[in-house]
């Protein structure tokens, strides 16, 4: 087959396929021409071309998150690589294996006033697991052996242990489009054998025996759906001395799991807080959205805290860490749940600790419902109506950061197959691109994105890609720009809140929808929302439903629903 004459570029493509990569998101360029030829001419790789590298990287992230497979990125030299940084950083903190491959100029031309040239090796070093630097044309067989090993090291590193992104930098000399015939080239993959993750029955029973009589609070952060984990956590939640708190992003669905939102903690008064403090806290998953939960746990007098996970750092979010159990949650909890259920099988009646949590959750749910019925048109009630009207058809939900993830968490999201948000570093950039990637990877139904106006405008490049599918629906929350800053305590009382924080926007969502070929719907009242929502979900896609609200009213409603009354 006719292919690039650059050995390392061809073998990088072979390595991707050997390690299970199926999707490669590329961006146009000249220096990366050999790489583009290599990946596009490999029959086992599907390429998607996206002009905007920042958007391309978030699309790749969305594909990786939903497919649970490594995804590669290919860019040209210069600042193109730096545009990957936000998504790569998010992937690092969400433990997603993005394989970044950047074309570079020859080493002798760095810092020599040559165009589109910068110091690329280690440019992403703060948020990749490994960086490697190679020439496109090895000098001899020994260097080919070296580069084969480096490609193995990089790809194995991306997938091993706690997964994450890696960076492969390839220095390419001219001519860039030279080609030759190559047949039956193979990549020598080095097999790395690791022992399976396993908790022995003896260890699980020893741990369970130590804590069987303690009040246990399990807190779940964000994570992918996992049937075995869900079953284990549900069984723990049924025990008389165990309370499970989970945010919607944890993707745990059970009547025995209490859903977390800031409104839950507004019902816990200072004089009663001791009754909610566990003897043992067990945490797992990614970052928590609820500031109230974090504040409560950090201030509580908790004697013992276990964190379960494969992160390389010690995760002490709540400042009480006593034990780091370095194994994945799906490997740990089924054994631990089995042991604790066996030891507590004859326990009768629930603890006062658990009664306290169940009571506050039930009371706050009723209070929240009544409050939202008694307020004028606002974003929280509107989103609640959209979520309630969403079809139960295996739909995935993507949330942007800021107001969207907080407001959506006030509703029950169990009808969705999974719920995701870029909470690795919680940026507002890339939400739409991530949803585009997620919709490409998810085969079970539609993808619904709920996004704020600032996040939406930040990532318009996603709509310009060629990969908007008929399975993508977008709910745009338009409160004039950055309405969350009128709600959060740090900014709402500042005189500059409107001029410097909200950055009030005049987003013409209808014109944007028309420009990019999306069906458009609009709601600015309960009546218009009731008319728009059925058509939005039943009509053609991709589509945008713009919900226009007043930022001041939204802030007042959110403040009211998270106060203790």
Task: Locate the predicted segments by residue.
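Phosphate/pyrophosphate-binding active-site segments
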Residues: 1-4, 134, 297-403, 510-511, ...
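Glycine/aspartate-rich loop-and-adjacent alpha/beta segment that forms the canonical ThDP
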Residues: 122, 163-165, 170-200, 532-565
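Glycine-rich, anion-gripping cofactor-binding loops and their flanking helix/strand elements
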Residues: 220-306, 314, 414-444, 457-461, ...
């Amino acid at each position: 087959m006719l292919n690039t004459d650059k050995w390392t570029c061809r073998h990088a493509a072979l390595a991707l396929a050997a390690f299970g990569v199926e999707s490669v998101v590329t961006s146009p360029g000249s220096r990366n021409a050999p790489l583009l030829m290599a990946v596009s001419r490999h029959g086992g790789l599907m390429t998607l071309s996206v002009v905007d590298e920042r958007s391309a990287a978030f699309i790749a992230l969305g594909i990786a998150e939903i497919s649970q497979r490594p995804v590669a990125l290919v860019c040209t030299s210069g600042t193109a690589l730096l545009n990957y940084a936000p998504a790569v950083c998010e992937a690092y903190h969400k433990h997603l294996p993005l394989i970044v491959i950047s074309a570079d100029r020859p080493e002798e031309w760095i810092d020599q006033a040559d165009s589109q040239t910068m110091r690329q090796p280690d440019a992403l070093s703060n948020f990749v697991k490994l960086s490697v630097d190679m020439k496109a044309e090895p000098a001899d067989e020994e260097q080919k052996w070296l580069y084969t090993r480096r490609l193995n090291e990089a790809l194995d590193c991306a997938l091993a242990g706690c997964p994450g992104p890696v960076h492969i930098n390839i220095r390419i000399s001219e001519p860039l489009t030279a080609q030759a015939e190559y047949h039956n080239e193979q990549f020598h993959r080095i097999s790395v054998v690791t022992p399976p993750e396993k908790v022995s029955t003896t260890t699980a029973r020893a741990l369970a025996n130590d804590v069987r009589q303690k009040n246990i609070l399990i807190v779940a952060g964000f994570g992918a759906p996992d049937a075995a984990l869900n079953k284990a956590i549900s069984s723990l939640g049924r025990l008389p001395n165990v309370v499970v708190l989970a945010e919607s992003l944890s993707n745990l669905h059970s009547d025995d799991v209490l859903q977390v939102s800031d409104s839950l903690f507004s019902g816990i008064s200072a004089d009663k807080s001791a009754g909610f403090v566990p003897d043992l806290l067990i945490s797992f998953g990614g970052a928590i959205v609820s500031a109230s939960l974090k504040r409560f746990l950090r201030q509580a007098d908790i004697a013992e805290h276990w964190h379960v996970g494969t992160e390389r750092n010690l995760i002490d979010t709540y400042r009480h860490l006593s034990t780091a159990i370095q194994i994945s949650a799906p490997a740990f909890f089924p054994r631990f749940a089995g042991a604790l259920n066996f030891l507590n099988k004859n326990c009768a009646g629930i603890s006062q600790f658990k009664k306290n949590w169940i009571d506050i959750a039930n009371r706050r749910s009723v209070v929240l419902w009544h409050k939202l019925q008694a307020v004028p048109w606002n974003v929280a009630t509107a989103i609640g109506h959209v979520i309630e009207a969403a079809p139960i058809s295996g739909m995935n939900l993507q949330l942007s950061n800021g107001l969207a993830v907080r407001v959506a968490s006030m509703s029950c999201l169990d009808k969705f197959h999974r719920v995701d948000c870029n909470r690795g570093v919680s940026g507002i950039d890339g939400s739409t691109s991530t949803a585009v990637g997620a919709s490409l990877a998810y085969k079970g139904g539609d993808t619904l994105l709920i996004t704020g106006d600032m996040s939406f405008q930040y990532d318009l490049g996603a709509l310009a890609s060629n990969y908007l599918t008929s399975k993508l629906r977008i709910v745009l929350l338009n409160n004039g720009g950055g309405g969350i800053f009128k709600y959060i305590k740090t900014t709402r009382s500042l005189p500059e809140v409107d001029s410097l924080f909200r950055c009030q926007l005049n987003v013409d969502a209808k014109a944007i929808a028309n420009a990019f070929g999306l069906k458009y719907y609009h709601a600015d009242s309960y009546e218009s929302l009731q008319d728009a929502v059925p058509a939005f979900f039943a009509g053609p896609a991709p589509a945008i439903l713009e919900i226009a609200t007043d930022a001041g009213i939204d802030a007042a409603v959110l403040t009211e629903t998270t106060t203790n009354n």
